[in-house]
Amino acid sequence: MEGVNSSSSISDLDELARLLDRPRVNIERKRSFDERSFSEMGIFDNVNSPGGWETPVSSARNSFEPHPMVAEAWDALRRSLVYFRGQPVGTIAAYDHATEEVLNYDQVFVRDFVPSALAFLMNGEPDIVKNFLLKTIQIQGREKRIDRFKLGEGAMPASFKVIHDPIKETDSINADFGESAIGRVAPVDSGFWWIILLRAYTKSTGDTSLAETSECQKGMRLILSLCLSEGFDTFPTLLCADGCSMIDRRMGVYGYPIEIQALFFMALRSAMSMLKHDAEGKEFMERIVKRLHALSFHMRSYFWLDFQQLNDIYRYKTEEYSHTAVNKFNVIPDSIPEWVFDFMPLRGGYFIGNVSPARMDFRWFALGNCVAILASLATPEQSASIMDLIEERWEELVGEMPVKICHPAIESHEWRIVTGCDPKNTRWSYHNGGSWPVLLWLLTAACIKTGRPQIARRAIDLAEARLLKDGWPEYYDGKSGRFIGKQARKFQTWSIAGYLVAKMLLEDPSHLGMISLEEDKQTKPVIKRSYSWT
């Protein structure tokens, strides 16, 4: 793994210096960014990370000048607000009048609302976020059944819909815990996003009273009980079904997907900072600390892939027995796909999609890797390597519209087997290598934390060239993300909010504190690279 080159990234330092000279927005709410130390913010540990010279050059336009898209985006975001008894409680998934078939796009999705919530928090409007957090925790308390099976008490809804009765002049809420979803899979990520958003609200407002309420404390404990329960697993990672997260259709991510593991890690660390130090809280804290230590070691050791590790796997022996085995998961080297040898640069690395017995999914997944950086699941060196990979493989991972949800696409016979001939997930479309503008905020946050703001600026420039003109599509198709998705909804709320959050993060990097965690030295294991000798 490459070390940090202190002589590189001078352009990054100049860029950050310009950021710090700018005045704060809503300065009365918190100290200005330039009054806070880099170490306190915990986002500039890797300012001198390698590869700064190769960062794609942004356009000469100053992105901090008011862009016409910003006002349009705020108008569109506010049009998507959903009200319950006169109070805003979320935003609908899409506000597309041109589409007659609404499906469930008129509902408030937990994961979809996160970028909307962050936009409102960064704009000094926390009330809607508070309302959402309280409403969803009330929904969590309902009895949840799919057919004749009762779901776990801590399960959070995938979405909910506010039903207005004009005759009785009453509002009611219908929640979906997976019983109406395609494939009938419960959302594993909803509970994690809820905890992460609760911490973001607390960090942004300085108000700890919401997290300290009995409702929120109980809600966190119920979510944690589900994912910390003992079972037959020999790994600290969470075993999941296909379709349990943002990729909510069959895409071969069953097992231990990187997205869920990264969110799990971030939610555990977020909960640690908010649980009360009473008897119940301390019990969960002890369990969290043990799990974090095991999870960080497992992910950093077995999910991480760089050129050297790929070469090691290529040379693995198989059928090794006992605790001395180097090839612990008995991965057959012949199962390594051909594309990864060309894709892996000498400089760079990433967390692969999945690791389980005799199986490694070498695909790149953007959300999981960006969250790994924000949660400090990735070490500073690994975080820098992920950004190096994005720079080295810009055309493949960003292309003409940020950001590819995964790479590469699966096709032909593999597509038929893995997706079940899913007509929506054809190659380079939707979840199968499609480009999703919502991921722009996660990429931007990861860029700022690793001291690479130029990468984010270049990606935002690409988005600004088309997003508004195209009507804020849900996703784009094609190998480079050139075409509006064949079934993409227009005025997709999280595409709008993702853009706003990315812009506000670049304008005021101190916002990153609400969605970023510094590295916990206690969970940092000593990682020794294993070699398989022939």
Curated annotation (Swiss-Prot):
Transmembrane segments: none annotated. GO terms for molecular function: beta-fructofuranosidase activity; endo-alpha-N-acetylgalactosaminidase activity. The keyword Hydrolase applies. The modification Phosphoserine is found at S7, S37, S532. GO terms for biological process: carbohydrate metabolic process. It catalyses: Hydrolysis of terminal non-reducing beta-D-fructofuranoside residues in beta-D-fructofuranosides. It comes from the Eukaryota. Coiled coil: none annotated. The modification Phosphothreonine is found at T55. Keywords: Carbohydrate metabolism, Glycosidase, Hydrolase, Phosphoprotein. Its EC number is 3.2.1.26. The keyword Oxidoreductase does not apply. Gene3D superfamilies: 1.50.10.10. Invertase that cleaves sucrose into glucose and fructose. Belongs to the glycosyl hydrolase 100 family. This is Probable alkaline/neutral invertase D. It comes from Arabidopsis thaliana (Mouse-ear cress). The gene is INVD.
